[in-house]
Design a protein with these regions (language model features):
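Positively charged n-region of N-terminal signal peptides that target proteins for export
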Residues: 1-4
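Active-site-adjacent substrate-binding region
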Residues: 325-349
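Active-site histidine-acidic residue metal-binding/catalytic motifs
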Residues: 210-291, 295-299, 307-308, 325
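Structural recognition of the beta-strand scaffold that forms the well-ordered cores
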Residues: 152, 227-231, 272-276, 299-303, ...
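Short linear recognition/processing motifs and adjacent strand/loop elements at protein termini
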Residues: 19-229, 249, 253, 263, ...
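Active-site-adjacent mobile loop/cap segments within catalytic or ligand-binding domains
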Residues: 295, 300-309, 319-320, 348-404
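Bacterial N-terminal signal peptides
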Residues: 6-15
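Solvent-exposed, polar/charged alpha-helical surfaces in well-ordered, non-transmembrane soluble domains
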Residues: 66, 72, 251-259, 263, ...
Length: 404
């Protein structure tokens, strides 16, 4: 079945008040109430600003809706602690950290924002769908499967797109069109040719007048030709967990296992392997994400070790955030179980920073639990890094066989 990308554009930023509790949203999703004092405008700033679905929090932070480009215009309707509440549609709000935005006192809200013409084309790495926009308006992206589908919501825009210029034969995109679903929601569809999600990104050009939906070309379906990134978790002043029996820090173990994986991949003929760190150095999550964005691997494998306050909890596990990348994590988990480890599970919608990028398939491997005596003994065995590396490599081979 053909894959499908869906892009949803939602019309008109709607605002409420900046009091402790949100007011009832404005009734119109098309015309902004430009005379109301109950909102103010901000623009995103800094590295990797993101919106969250709500005010919840845990050790991984709140549930992320999407990362945003810089300079994106948002309409603040309320404030809660360290977050602003922004209106995306008459019924959908998002939360963003106050430190991720700067006040915009110059821009005036328009009564409506209209999309212009589109153009599709390809270069040597990506298919592009470029939408003419009147402003840097917010968006979010999600993946779907069966059929594969990408959904991107653009908020604050109504269609005035009267032609879509399609230049040449695209490598990944079969067709693209749109439908105005309701006031405040424009849905853009993109049929895909590939059977696997290989990654996408959404960003504005330097003028803010073009929104580029960029679909990554599938690489060669051969392990030797893949560009694989390997991330050794923690490092430097971030020691991670430690075992109760041997006391070895997670940051040391992740580097040992990552090096073993690099060696195994090169032994299998993989020509390009990128390591986020090779020494005991401190790297923040944003630094790793930006490093990987610049490097643009075909896939990312991140190595960690689990821990629990209950020492009977045990097993190996793999994690993903985006459903389109789940197949990679499933086959690797199946191979990891062959090591005699119990299965802790295949965990989805995981809010780990390196599971967040949409530009490339990624898999977080939690080898086993340092807090469990049996798992820790397995982890510390001198042959285990090599065995784990082999199973991960075999999982990659299995995954490539799934691709049509």
């Amino acid at each position: 079945m053909k894959n499908l990308i869906v892009v949803i554009c939602s019309c008109c930023l709607l605002f409420m008040s900046s009091h402790a509790q949100p007011k009832t949203p404005f009734s119109s999703a098309i015309t902004g109430n430009t005379s109301s004092p109950d909102f103010f405008l901000v623009r995103t700033k800094g590295i990797l600003p993101y919106m969250e679905y709500g005010p919840g929090d845990d050790r991984l932070g709140g549930a992320k809706m999407t990362y945003l480009d810089s300079g994106v215009l948002l309409k603040v309707i309320d404030s809660l602690g360290t977050d602003y509440i922004v209106a995306l549609t008459s019924s959908l709000h998002a939360f963003i950290q106050k430190t991720s935005v700067i006040s915009d006192t110059v821009t005036k809200v328009k009564s409506h924002y209209l999309s212009g013409n589109w153009k599709t084309y390809q270069d040597n790495r990506f298919d592009h769908i470029v939408v003419t926009m009147p402003e840097r308006l917010p968006y979010r992206g999600t993946m779907q499967v069966s059929p594969n589908r990408l959904i991107i919501d653009l908020f604050g825009i109504t269609s005035n797109t009267n032609w879509i210029t399609q230049v040449g034969q695209l490598r990944e995109v079969a067709n693209t069109w749109y439908e105005q679903m309701e006031n405040g929601m424009l849905r853009v569809y993109v049929d895909l040719k590939s059977s696997m999600h290989w990654g996408y990104s959404v960003h504005y050009d330097s003028t803010g007048s073009k929104l580029d939906i960029r679909i990554k070309h599938a690489p060669a379906k051969n392990l030797k030709q893949l560009f694989v990134a390997v991330d050794a978790g923690h490092g430097g002043n971030n020691t991670g967990a430690a075992g109760d029996i041997y006391g070895k820090a997670e940051k040391v173990l992740t580097l040992e296992y990552a090096r073993a994986l690099e060696k195994e991949l090169k032994r299998a003929g993989v020509k390009r392997v990128f390591m986020t760190r090779r020494t005991d150095t401190s790297l923040s999550m944003p630094e790793r994400i930006m490093m990987l964005r610049d490097t643009m691997p075909d896939i990312l494998l991140s190595i960690h070790f689990n821990s629990s306050s209950v020492d009977t909890v045990n097993g190996t596990s793999t994690f993903y955030r985006h459903i389109g990348f789940r197949p990679l994590t499933q086959v690797i988990l199946n191979r990891m179980k062959q090591l005699g480890l119990n299965e802790f599970g295949n965990v989805g919608s995981f809010n780990f920073a390196l599971s967040g990028p949409t530009e490339y398939p990624n898999c977080l491997v939690e080898v086993a639990f340092l807090s469990n005596p049996a798992d820790e003994r397995f982890i510390m065995h001198k042959k285990s890094p090599e065995k784990v590396a082999r199973k991960i490599r075999e999982g990659l081979t299995d995954w490539l066989r799934l691709i049509k």
